[in-house]
């Protein structure tokens, strides 16, 4: 399959890099990536001290929150999330 290549307004070739994964051990749940993404790709989810997902209503069980990929299909490959992440949690790949 061919690689998806776009051209910027200035004529430079650009290959979108789509979000593949978030390293949840490194994620500090700061929300910077969530604010940078205007496409509703990400969601902040809660974990308990055993590393299991918990509902936000169970406040007493929440150990910490981490970012997750909620809607991968909405990613446009801009990598804004990765650029603002202070812990470099993101892995991106081009379409092949």
UniProtKB/Swiss-Prot annotation:
Record's subunit section: Homodimer.
Transmembrane segments: none
Pfam families: Fer4_7
The name this protein goes by in its record: Ferredoxin-3
InterPro entries tied to this protein: 4Fe4S_Fe-S-bd, 4Fe4S_Fe_S_CS, FdIII_4_nif, Fe-S_Ferredoxin
Species of provenance: Leptolyngbya boryana
Cofactor(s) for this UniProt protein: [4Fe-4S] cluster
Keyword Signal attached: no
Coiled coil: none
Keyword Repeat found: yes
PROSITE patterns: 4FE4S_FER_1, 4FE4S_FER_2
Encoding gene, per UniProt annotation: fdxB
Summary of the function given for this chain in its UniProt record: Ferredoxins are iron-sulfur proteins that transfer electrons in a wide variety of metabolic reactions.
Binding site for [4Fe-4S] cluster 1: 27, 30, 33, 37
GO biological process, one term: nitrogen fixation
GO MF terms held by the record: 4 iron, 4 sulfur cluster binding; metal ion binding
Domain 4Fe-4S ferredoxin-type: 18-47, 65-95
